[in-house]
Amino acid sequence: MFRGINAITIDTKGRLAIPTRYRSALGAEDKIPLVVTIDTEETCLLLYTAAQWQIIEDNLQKLPSFNAAARRIQRLLIGHATDVEVDANGRVLLPTVLRNYAKLEKDVVMIGQGNKFEVWNKELWESKREQWLAEEASMTDGLPEEMKTFSL
């Protein structure tokens, strides 16, 4: 399980250094590829283990092919999905098209989300986080039904 926020610098070649504490869980020592794709809801990237991505891709493939919204999601997520390998120094090369989509330049954050990481432009992340905290503080609708029995 991946959790926590890690501030990272992308080098001039577009390589992202995976924090040491996650490398074995991601299969870096075994040269198992990771999969990176776009997030269709936010301006960030999603980084999965190959095994976790396969589950998601299988589910995406099961969506109805005559549904325009389903095809759009398939095109975006599967179409942008790229296998990336962890090099000997624990880095992955993020494709230019994906870095451009997420506005990743130098300072980024990796945010653990359980089964995946989100990779954000640091300034964009800080702005969104402040927005979400403000929205949470001013919520008048209350929690969604699914969360009313949830406890921390």
UniProtKB/Swiss-Prot annotation:
InterPro entries for the chain: MraZ, MraZ_C, MraZ_dom, MraZ_N, MraZ_sf, SpoVT-AbrB_dom, SpoVT-AbrB_sf
What GO cellular component entries does it have?
cytoplasm; nucleoid
Give any single GO term for biological process.
Answer: negative regulation of DNA-templated transcription initiation
- Quick one: where is this thing mainly located? cytoplasm
Localization, per the record, is:
Cytoplasm, Nucleoid
Entry's Pfam families? MraZ (PF02381)
> Keywords assigned by UniProt?
Cytoplasm, DNA-binding, Repeat, Transcription, Transcription regulation
Domain of life the protein comes from = Bacteria
Ranges for domain SpoVT-AbrB come to 5-52, 81-124
Q: Which HAMAP family match?
A: MraZ
Tell me the protein family, please.
Belongs to the MraZ family.
NCBIfam families with a match to the protein in the record? division/cell wall cluster transcriptional repressor MraZ
- Self-association and partners: Forms oligomers.
The name on file for this protein is: Transcriptional regulator MraZ
As recorded in Swiss-Prot or TrEMBL, the protein's gene is named mraZ
